[in-house]
Amino acid sequence: MELIEKHASFGGWQNVYRHYSQSLKCEMNVGVYLPPKAANEKLPVLYWLSGLTCNEQNFITKSGMQRYAAEHNIIVVAPDTSPRGSHVADADRYDLGQGAGFYLNATQAPWNEHYKMYDYIRNELPDLVMHHFPATAKKSISGHSMGGLGALVLALRNPDEYVSVSAFSPIVSPSQVPWGQQAFAAYLAENKDAWLDYDPVSLISQGQRVAEIMVDQGLSDDFYAEQLRTPNLEKICQEMNIKTLIRYHEGYDHSYYFVSSFIGEHIAYHANKLNMR
């Protein structure tokens, strides 16, 4: 991995690395925050998945997470949201193509050549992190919007791999809302069974489980009713007896002003779970 940025932050280092991804067949950037204790010991890892139009920079520059990661001794890994490059398929819209990988494995041309974000996040990236950084095998996952969707899907489909999961403003029923339907139709065609493999509410209804789900949702979020539908997740978790910590916040929107307001509580939540395991 090639170090391309290095910034001192709260006694540790906020770095950005570039590497070639075998899964995605392109160069990828990934942000890695190494807290002070990482200089002398191995630490657990929190993976953060960002939302539509984002790259590895949004979370590491806007959330203020470094303060809390340093306090709780957690390495934070923030990858890009899709494969990148002039040779990678793209679309003239913000919710498909580069910047909108949806953390799935595309099956349809032209997307299936590079869009294997599910494999990248689940397999390739953790292997790289374990090899290059002072990381233990314990990991948790979180994300925002499309990234919250990805975090929930990865945790629900791999409950033994992630100690805990949380999300900000996640797309919880993508097969039922425009963002998800448009992306799934392009990446997965009209195979509705494949769609449900990347739909948190559907996965839970089919019996997939995690110990607990933490979600924060702003009630002034312009996408809340049409695209996110957080109450669908709350309802299915109640029906399936999955413990939740779902909080609704008056006045907060979909932006990083919202994420930065509560990221400290999410990192503390994951730190507690990681230290218990």
Swiss-Prot record:
EC number: 3.1.2.12
Top-level division of the source organism's lineage: Bacteria
Listed GO biological process terms: formaldehyde catabolic process
Catalytic activity: S-formylglutathione + H2O = formate + glutathione + H(+)
Keywords: Hydrolase, Serine esterase
Coiled coil feature spans: none
One Pfam family this sequence matches: Esterase
GO molecular function: carboxylic ester hydrolase activity; S-formylglutathione hydrolase activity
A GO cellular component annotation in the UniProt record: cytosol
Alphabetized InterPro entries for the sequence: AB_hydrolase_fold, Esterase-like, S-formylglutathione_hydrol
Catalytic-site annotation from UniProt: S145, D221, H254
Protein family according to the UniProt entry: Belongs to the esterase D family.
Alphabetized PANTHER family for the sequence: S-FORMYLGLUTATHIONE HYDROLASE
Function, as annotated: Serine hydrolase involved in the detoxification of formaldehyde. Hydrolyzes S-formylglutathione to glutathione and formate.
NCBIfam families: fghA_ester_D
Protein name: S-formylglutathione hydrolase FrmB
Record organism: Escherichia coli (strain ATCC 8739 / DSM 1576 / NBRC 3972 / NCIMB 8545 / WDCM 00012 / Crooks)
